[in-house]
Amino acid sequence: MTIVYDVTGHKGGGGKQHTPQETPDSLHSLAKIRILLALGEGEFEGITSASELRQRVYLDGTPIQNADLSENFPGARVEFRPGTQHQDVIHGFSAVESEQSVGVKLENGTPWVRQINDTSLDAVRVRIGIPALYTSEDNGDLVGGRIDYKIVVYTDNADPREFTFAAVGKTMSLYERDHRIELPPNVNTGWRVEVHRITADSTSAKVVNDIQVQSITEIIDARLRYPLTALLFVEFDAKAFQNIPRVSIKCKGRKVLIPNNYDPINHTYSGDWDGTFKRAWSDNPAWHWYDICITERFGLGRRIKPQMLNRYALYQIAQRCDQLVSDGNGGREIRFKNDMYIQSQTDAWTVLKDLAAIFAGMTWWGNQMLNIVSDQPVAAVSHTITNASVIDGRFDYASGSQKTRYSTFAVAYGNPKNHYDDAIATGQRVELVRRHKINRLDITAIGCTRESEAQRRGHWALISNQLDQQVSFKVGMEGLFFIPGSVVAIADTNISGGFETRGGRLLSDPGTRTVLNTDSEITFRPGDKFLVRTDSGNVETREIASVNGNKVTLKTALDADPIPDQPFCVDGDDIQLQKFRITDLEYDDSTSTFSVRGIEYNDSKYDAVDNGARLDPGIFTQVPDGVMKGPESVTITPSQISSQGQLITNVDIVFPPVKDAVVYEIQWRRTSLQNMAVQWGNDWVNIPRTASNGAHIPNVFSGNYQARVRAIGMGEISSPWVSSAITPVEGRLGGLNAPIITNAISGLHQILWKWNHNNAATDISYTELEVRKTGETEWKFLTNVPYPGAEYAQTSLEFGIYQQLRARVADKIGNLSDWSAPFEGQVSDKVDEYMKGLDDEFLTSEDGKRFQEAIDTVPQGIYEAMLTDAQQLFNARAEYKGIYAEIKVAYNVAADAHKAVAQLETLIGTRLDDAEAAIHTLQTAQSTQEQAFAQYQQTVAAKFSEQEAAIQQVQTATADVAGALAEYKTQVAAQFGQQSAAIEQKMTSSFNHAGGSATYSLKAGVTYNGTYYDAGMQLSVVTEGDAVKSSIAFKADQFYIMHPSNGSLSSAFIVDGGAVYIDTARIKDATINFAQITDTLQSNNYDGDTRGWRLGKDGTFINLGTGNGGGMKQTNTQISVKDGNGVLRVQIGEITGSW
């Protein structure tokens, strides 16, 4: 089938007298741009009129219609669909089209071909382009032309369908036309589309008639409504733009679920909310957050159900968003609103956090719910926390570094006056600029289209950055009651200064609603408030009326009963409680504890953000700032009183009180009145710390006195010392006599010092002792011995050293005597005493007693089952005339209210006449209310008549309230008649309240003719109190240490009986009570001629010095001296005339 289409233009006229003329263009492209935009998930708030719609739609930022109804784009067509379920179809977009560019020039005889395999298509649209079409006549006229072409469609094996077209007329620029070609239905493999040029190709420059295929579009016809999708359709003349313009619309967005008592336009609430919703448009960010959570099509509704959200907490947040605040220009506006347009798929958690950030919110998952909290003021704290209610009483604090301290901000927001392009709102906190200089914080305010709100967000960020102190602590199962976002009050004595009790716990008997029983007496000031959680589940705050010991009386009764052992805090104006908002909870299953973290909370923050009010930093400590000042003056005032007929002189030290001082440290000293140069004989005497501004010293000696005082504030901040003038005082005559050291008794590693006090005074307090090694100059403090003690044992000293001691006495008010004369003593240097003492010390100790224990050398074979009342699990036995082989497995289990026990026994045994062999195991586990016990025992034994051999292994573990014990023992034993031998290896570790020990021993024993002989070794470490001793002991008649030499062994060290033999010894420092020389004693540099010395067994002593020449020789009858040349110079005794 052939269809012919003609498109005809017109040509110019003629005349007899001809002037070349050009025919006007008669071919014009008339292209329309049609755009269909999916604005978002519906349903959107509707647009009431066509005029309103045209004024809300923009092409490249220009509205289609102005407010005065004048048109900027005449003929433009605009349609809007809000995204309802059954919305109308937008006409003009009745198909789904896919356009593909081609741009191929057609030539006669060479068609353009495209194979189409998508059998779901309904039609194709072929766009033809003619760059220019004209003919230049011989007379110079420029007229139109003609070009013919056809489109042919081939379908499977059917006859082709042919469509013929012609373009007639003139154009000097690109002329385009579209041809929609219906495709035959019911095909199997698809279609082939061909475009042919019928007109012959031009061969003359006078004829211009090129033609080309511009594009092909695949079309599927449909009447699409796009339910639940808001749509915008725009159609306009393509000649109005060089490129496709940006299309935008200013409209209200998606309708969301809001409370049924809420007016979203006026942002008001009527009456109480019953928890039900209605669907309407709203710019309240809280309900947008809720909508994202529950919507299944594009949100989290497939995973989050409405019952998994706290709608009432969200209702409170939404009301805060709608509260009116200053707009900075004298007006009022709602606090937060959301103009966010989500245009792309994003991680759900990120979207929720971004939405929550609009109202300073935090999203978290807990208790099988998705929770949301906002940074907003709280009416009351949720918990009271003290050092007594956290693990180890410890709070850890942290804050940001100087680099993260910001003072100015730049907030980017969408400016509606400039088509919502980004604009910048800037601001600063003056006090932060003074402190941190200029450090700008850059923020993008999501969903913000108001400069005033951008300002508030910037100030909120700066103040939050300023209030960035973080706290972390650990609690037990009380952490179950902590909720992220809740605010807690903390009374930390380390912060408050530690001098006052501002928190604790109620007793197990908490008291009444008016009078509460606390675990300690609190510090109370008028107006202080008592905070404690009650049975209502809330923390109640009441003003304190009075405090009497551990009883606190409230001015107003609590609303509910107090809870036993509940933490409490005291809040006041002078010292306020720290408050933190909980941000994170982490449970440690291994310790059953919660790690809690929080960020600083300040009630004044929110008024500072909304209205620019001053931020109140709070007072949380009594520790003063800066340096503590000392007293302005210190005065010594003597006074006299008569007591029992005696005149007694006292001294008072007085000074004015110091601001912020908690206690004072006072010292004084004295010298004699005759000491005009004031060389102090006494060191400073300390008076115990006092909170009063003075001290009293009774019954003083005469002398020149001086005192000094310093003030101590919170946190142990101390002032400089302030001294008094030197003041003469007439008091008791004389002074304390120096004690007399009477004896120094030598002992093993100790000296027992004894002295006489040498004083008639009855008010002696103690004797001060100082020591030094003989030959040293510096004295070191040893101890103070309370009166009337007159001896002291100085222990843990080195062997044989000499020590010097000096002493002085002090009376009860601090007067000191002069030092006594030094007295010298020596630590014992008698080796036999040390050896006997060390022997006794070791052998009488617990590990020494274990070392002396004899082992049982008789084998302990087990050939029969031991669990007589056990239940039998398995028994296999073969027997023939008294000869048998058997295997037994038995068990015993029992449990009652006081004990649980389990035992398992195995026995493998054989017997033939007098020959027996067995392998036996017994495993026991037992638990009682007082002890846990486990033991594994294995015995391998063989017996023939009276000969027996056995290997036994026992492993035992015991634990109870008193301690723990673990023991591992292996014994190998053999017996022949009455003779027996055994080797035992034993490892024992134990610990209890008194101390602990670890011991390893190895013993070998023989019982021969009724007498026991053994050898062994033992390693042990024993703790007793603060002392720890380790030892290695050997027991043997002979002890050898050998080394290989030239292929054989030789002894380097031998102990035989009580004698020690050493082959070669090098000793750095030796103390010898008695030495026997069996050959020669000489120096290591002795060469027999020029240097060194030598003492021979025959008594000859030769001393040659260090090699400078000369020498001396001494025998039992002669002394001879020679010079450096070997010439004899002196000879005494037997005169021989020769060296």
Swiss-Prot record:
This is Tip attachment protein J. Attaches the virion to the host receptor, inducing viral DNA ejection. During tail assembly, initiates distal tail tip assembly. During virus entry to host cell, binds strongly to host receptor in an irreversible attachment. The binding induces structural changes in the tail leading to viral DNA injection. PANTHER family: FELS-1 PROPHAGE HOST SPECIFICITY PROTEIN-RELATED (PTHR36251), GIFSY-2 PROPHAGE HOST SPECIFICITY PROTEIN J, PHAGE LAMBDA (PTHR36251:SF2). Coiled coil: none annotated. Its main location: virion. The keyword Nucleotide-binding does not apply. It comes from the Viruses. InterPro entries: GpJ_CSF, GpJ_HDII-ins2, J_dom, Viral_Tip_Attach_Protein. Keywords: Host cytoplasm, Ubl conjugation, Viral release from host cell, Viral tail assembly, Viral tail protein, Virion. The gene is J. Ubiquitinated by the Bil antiviral defense system when the Bil system is expressed in E.coli MG1655 and infected with this virus, or when this protein is expressed in a strain with the Bil system. Belongs to the Caudoviricetes tip attachment protein J family. GO terms for cellular component: host cell cytoplasm. It is found in: Virion; Host cytoplasm.
